[in-house]
Amino acid sequence: MQQIKFIDLFSGMSGIRKGFEQACRKQSVACKCVFTSEIKPAALEVLKQNYPDEVPYGDITKIETGDIPDFDILLAGFPCQAFSFAGKRLGFEDTRGTLFFDVARILKAKKPKGFILENVEGLVTHDRKDPTQKIGRTLTVILETLEALGYYVSWKVLNAKDFGIPQNRKRIYLTGSLKSKPDLSFETTPSPKLKNILESGLPTESSPFIKKLLKKFPPSELYGKSVKDKRGGKNNIHSWDIELKGAVTEEEKQLLNILLKERRKKKWASEIGIDWMDGMPLTKAQISTFYKHPDLQNILDSLTDKGYLVLEHPKQKIGGQRIKDESLPKGYNIVSGKKSFEINKILDPNDVAPTLVAMDMEHLFVVDNGGLRTLTGKEGLRLFGYPDDYSFDIPKKDKYDLLGNTVAVPVIKAVSERLLHTL
């Protein structure tokens, strides 16, 4: 087979490119990237470090197809966006105004031999009006558009942990060829444990929060624990478990643990005539129905003063948003937020990592050297199957942002091999 020329759109860290190149090498096929498009500054810096002789193009929406060299394969990890349906279905034209439109217009103009697209699992049911349908309108239009362009298209949701990566990461992969439909049935590979990719003996962090956490729990007991005040469960540590906001009595702790579960019951919303909200503020009278204590008011006051509880109005659902209804009596609620604490989860080295997303990565910690630390850049790369020699010299915050949005390289490699078989 002669040299395969490919383009890499929405390149990010070039993960799709990496996987495709690995597949080509495995099959002894020469390949060359002739065009790269990316706009994020941190990603452009990483691309410069790894491909110093190449100059990426910018915003793909502003690039004419005539300015793109001829190529054989299109690679793209495009964002999931809804299409605007103005009455009659128009197929290709329905995609206008989205970044998939740019993928489609390039395929239409250049007619390459094939493509590989990657997206979040949610694309499968995105904009689905009927719950009984397997796929939503967005994916339906994408598939119809690709098939109308002459491609035999296959798609499948694949999990990175089935391809040798210790991360539970499901994504949808779409691939198409002008000759035949690529086969996306795979035998799964047992996933390695997180400990297989972790470094050891590195410096740990020592904030007041971490000191309180380690004072209450030895490191080995923290494996797999989440730290948040939104939920209960045996794998969850709450702020009162480590007395983060001040010492708590057994009675106070007992009340908090019961309230955490009770406030989620739908009957409380029904009692005051509002739509159910997950985490209702409850009045003293309501609390007294499930927690009977002669000193209840003092316990509630104490927990409010310390910052474990807040006295607030219930929220009505108005136009899809929750708005405080000041006509309803205030109730006691647990003070919580999605990013309440600097640690969201301590990863279990004997398990696989959860799906890594950009906004959560800096809140994921591992046990090391008798303490706790965040993931290193090298560990982050390994969790997506990047080689250790990949250059990644950018600030930690930017590393987490790029990693949370990148692809699992071994999955791309496997999909690429199937596409190459059709050429």
Curated annotation (Swiss-Prot):
InterPro entries: C5-MTase (IPR050750), C5_DNA_meth_AS (IPR018117), C5_MeTfrase (IPR001525), SAM-dependent_MTases_sf (IPR029063). Its EC number is 2.1.1.37. The keyword Transit peptide does not apply. The active site is at residue 80. GO terms for molecular function: DNA (cytosine-5-)-methyltransferase activity; DNA binding. Keywords: DNA-binding, Methyltransferase, Restriction system, S-adenosyl-L-methionine, Transferase. The keyword Methyltransferase applies. It comes from Neisseria lactamica. Belongs to the class I-like SAM-binding methyltransferase superfamily. C5-methyltransferase family. GO terms for biological process: DNA restriction-modification system; methylation. A methylase that recognizes the double-stranded sequence 5'-GGNNCC-3', methylates C-? on both strands, and protects the DNA from cleavage by the NlaIV endonuclease. This is Type II methyltransferase M.NlaIV. Pfam families: DNA_methylase. It catalyses: a 2'-deoxycytidine in DNA + S-adenosyl-L-methionine = a 5-methyl-2'-deoxycytidine in DNA + S-adenosyl-L-homocysteine + H(+). Disulfide bonds: none annotated. Residues 4-423 form the SAM-dependent MTase C5-type domain.
